[in-house]
Amino acid sequence: MDMTQESCRKFVEVLASDAPAPGGGGAAALVGAIGTALGNMVGSLTVGKKKYAEVEAEIIALKAKCDALQTELLNQVEADEVNFLPLAKAYGIPKDDPTRDAVMEEATIIACSTPLHIMELCCEAIEYISVFAAKGSRLAVSDAGCGAVCVKAALQAASLNVFINTKTLKNREVAEEMNAKCFAMLDKYGAMADEIFETVKAGFFK
């Protein structure tokens, strides 16, 4: 089921249930899309304003990228469900089945792929939001800050959905490679999102 076609209320109700999906990965994707949209809204409120004529072309181009990014993040809600279900099924294989370990290993790696991609998309979103925060309408700068906070939360949430799976991998080389990618993104873009938030916040007290 593509939960992005349901209402917000329905999404939250299913999220709170014992259904295998959506879970943390799907929620991270949705929050990332919301954060991206908040940044994009700043762009929408900037375009067409004489005060920002010098940056209008840049903002329009950035908005187009964010439009695509929002869609891609929303697509990850269903992708996470599709890529998690094989792992959920693998847990049902009897422990004495000789194929269990190999099936679990493959399914676990597949389950990591979507949250890793969500993280990559969130990093891209944070870069875009930093531009909206710096060059977009001052009347909507708080929304850029909110967007950065949301996307950082999505970045962190997605990482946990990687780590819970890499912990169980037998192939530690693959696990550590994925962990390293996550740590690098968390360090660089978590700090960037924090800087956006602090800069926006400080601007209200000058």
Report the location of each language-model feature.
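Preference for long, well-ordered alpha-helical segments
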Residues: 125-128, 140-199, 206
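Short, hydrophobic/aliphatic alpha-helical segments
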Residues: 3-21
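Transmembrane signal-anchor/signal-peptide helices with a preference for the extracytoplasmic
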Residues: 41-53
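Long, charge-rich low-complexity segments
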Residues: 79-91, 193-206
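Amphipathic alpha-helical coiled-coil segments
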Residues: 59, 66-73, 115, 122, ...
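A structural-propensity feature for long, helix-poor, extended segments
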Residues: 50-89
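Amphipathic alpha-helical interface segments
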Residues: 80-149, 153, 165
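Conserved phosphate/anionic-ligand binding catalytic regions in large, soluble enzymes, centered on
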Residues: 17-40, 140-158
